[in-house]
Curated annotation (Swiss-Prot):
<feature type="modified residue" description="Cysteine sulfenic acid (-SOH)">
    <location>
        <position position="286"/>
    </location>
</feature>
<keyword id="KW-0479">Metal-binding</keyword>
<dbReference type="InterPro" id="IPR029510">
    <property type="entry name" value="Ald_DH_CS_GLU"/>
</dbReference>
<feature type="binding site">
    <location>
        <position position="180"/>
    </location>
    <ligand>
        <name>K(+) 1</name>
    </ligand>
</feature>
<feature type="site" description="Seems to be a necessary countercharge to the potassium cations">
    <location>
        <position position="248"/>
    </location>
</feature>
<dbReference type="GO" id="GO:0008802">
    <property type="term" value="F:betaine-aldehyde dehydrogenase (NAD+) activity"/>
</dbReference>
<feature type="active site" description="Proton acceptor">
    <location>
        <position position="252"/>
    </location>
</feature>
<keyword id="KW-0520">NAD</keyword>
<keyword id="KW-0521">NADP</keyword>
<keyword id="KW-0630">Potassium</keyword>
<comment type="similarity">
    <text>Belongs to the aldehyde dehydrogenase family.</text>
</comment>
<comment type="pathway">
    <text>Amine and polyamine biosynthesis; betaine biosynthesis via choline pathway; betaine from betaine aldehyde: step 1/1.</text>
</comment>
<feature type="binding site" description="covalent">
    <location>
        <position position="286"/>
    </location>
    <ligand>
        <name>NAD(+)</name>
    </ligand>
</feature>
<comment type="subunit">
    <text>Dimer of dimers.</text>
</comment>
<feature type="binding site">
    <location>
        <begin position="150"/>
        <end position="152"/>
    </location>
    <ligand>
        <name>NAD(+)</name>
    </ligand>
</feature>
<dbReference type="Pfam" id="PF00171">
    <property type="entry name" value="Aldedh"/>
</dbReference>
<feature type="binding site">
    <location>
        <position position="27"/>
    </location>
    <ligand>
        <name>K(+) 1</name>
    </ligand>
</feature>
Length: 490
């Protein structure tokens, strides 16, 4: 018996049945409990959502900037009023610790929505003089109907990161959450409607990426796709979006990011930074700094600091606010992470901490994997080359600055990078040479609403957050005005 009622699609301002009886289960990864059955959208449901979005978008775009801003601000207020309720649901659905979802997921998502709500009246064009009798002006106009496809690790936050700039710019969005974690996005749709968003401006279609995601990316009347997920899937989404109708895309994809500890770093700060870069959210963060480079002569001391901190991690029931490390998001993902851990052992990396599934007591019911640290790693190991998306840190040693920069950049990914040093000259010199879109100096992980987020190389295309994301949900129309005589050559 599921804990919650059947979860339906959200189209045209309310819940509606899908076109078929097919459903999938939402599972609590902490104990295997079925939380709810969730309907699978059909291709006909996608078309229904597009028609609804087209109708709603015209109403939304015709509102004044201040009217749109006020509605989005009201949604922010409701999100904050229901923070704990939404955080509790997010914890059940994802397995993330409530101590995290309560203070981060909804809070930072609401911050992004508030940021863009404030920018709505600032969307403006330019006036360009040509001569005394003529000038050009530009308009930033909404794209129309856009699609958002979310990942499972930050469900409601990602839905807000994508919908906030899209709605602020006057678009309608059809959002497909991950099949693994669909519940809070449906609640977000309710909140938008309650805040006054016209029907159809934010529709939610649940189902698989192979089906619903593909139908969205191929739809000829959807103007843009914003996707968060793995690189392999992102390539397919981008190919489908461009081949169907030359859609614009934003791709926030995978990473295998380097964290460089320099020899002048405070080792306690370095260890704290490495812990946050690897074990926050049970290691399921795309920007994690899983390749930790340490000077050879500091390796033993750094390992001791890390082992001490790993021993302090409070693993347990994610609903307990004292817990700061919960299960992985699903049992299939747990098996994937355990496979990488086995590969690390097989290829000769030494296990400093963890390295196994947790099965004692209540842990046996859930997808719990011990925080794992490998040392004596080399650049050619699978655990160093491939994104694991779990609580697995790889410690590597180096000798010179030039060497570590070269090795840090020796990857197909380029999402994030960071370093720890007391020398700010070195910090900026090195950061400017690292091939990554998001970088931190003496810290890791913070992504403010004003900070553009995105990757280099195979870690993505375009940016989320910041003013650039708002602009990317608009298109520019140029208009020339002639006040003088017009002479034809014919």
């Amino acid at each position: 018996m599921a804990r919650f009622e059947l979860q339906k699609l959200y189209i045209d301002g309310g819940y509606t049945d899908a076109g078929s009886d097919a459903t999938f289960d939402a599972i609590n990864p902490a104990n295997g409990e079925v939380l709810a059955q969730v309907q699978r959208a059909t291709k006909e449901d996608v078309e229904r959502a597009v028609v609804s979005a087209e109708k709603g978008q015209k109403i939304w775009a015709a509102m004044t900037a201040m009217e749109r801003s006020r509605i989005l601000r009201r949604a922010v207020e409701i999100l904050r009023e229901r923070n704990d309720e939404l955080a509790a649901l997010e914890t059940l659905d994802t397995g993330k610790a409530f101590s995290e979802t309560k203070y981060v997921d909804i809070v930072t998502g609401a911050d992004v929505l508030e940021y863009y709500a404030g920018l709505v009246p600032a969307i403006e064009g330019e006036q360009i003089p040509l001569r005394t009798t003529s000038f050009v002006y530009t308009r930033r106009e909404p794209l129309g109907v856009v699609a958002g496809i979310g990942a499972w690790n930050y469900p409601i936050q990602i839905a807000l990161w994508k919908s906030a700039p899209a709605l602020a710019a006057g678009n309608a969005m059809i959002f497909k959450p991950s099949e693994v974690t669909s519940l809070t996005t449906l609640k977000l749709a309710e909140i938008y409607t309650e805040a006054g968003l016209p029907d159809g401006v934010f529709n939610v279609l649940t189902g698989s990426g192979r089906e619903v995601g593909t139908w969205l990316t191929e739809h000829p009347r959807i103007e843009k796709v914003s996707f968060t997920g793995g690189t392999d899937t992102g390539k397919k989404v981008m190919a489908s979006a461009s081949s169907s109708s030359l859609k614009d895309v934003t791709m926030e994809l995978g990473g295998k990011s380097p964290l460089i500890i320099f020899d002048d770093a405070d080792l306690d700060r370095a260890a704290d930074t490495a812990m946050m870069a690897n074990f926050y959210s049970s290691g399921q963060v795309c920007t994690n700094g899983t390749r930790v480079f340490v000077p050879s002569h500091l390796k033993a001391a750094f390992e001791a600091k890390i082992a001490e901190r790993v021993a302090r991690i409070r693993i347990g029931n994610p609903e307990d606010e004292n817990t700061n490390f919960g299960p992985l998001v699903s049992f299939p993902h747990m098996e994937s992470v355990l496979g990488y851990i086995a590969k690390g052992k097989e290829e000769g990396a030494r296990v400093l901490c963890g390295g196994e599934r947790l099965t004692d007591g209540e842990f046996a019911k859930g997808a719990f994997v011990a925080p794992t640290v490998f040392t004596d790693c080399t650049d050619d190991m699978t655990i160093v080359r491939e994104e694991i998306f779990g609580p697995v840190m790889a410690i590597l040693t180096y000798e010179t600055e030039e060497e570590v920069i070269r090795r840090a950049n020796d990857t197909d990914f380029g999402l994030a990078a960071g370093l720890v040093t007391k020398d700010l000259n070195r910090a900026h010199r090195v950061i400017h040479q690292l091939e990554a879109g998001i970088c931190w100096i003496n810290a890791w992980g913070e992504s403010d609403a004003k900070m553009p987020v995105g990757g280099y190389k195979q870690s993505g295309v375009g940016r989320e957050n910041g003013i650039s994301s708002l602009n990317n949900f608009t298109r520019i129309k140029s208009v020339q005005v002639e006040l003088g005589d017009y002479a034809s050559v014919f």
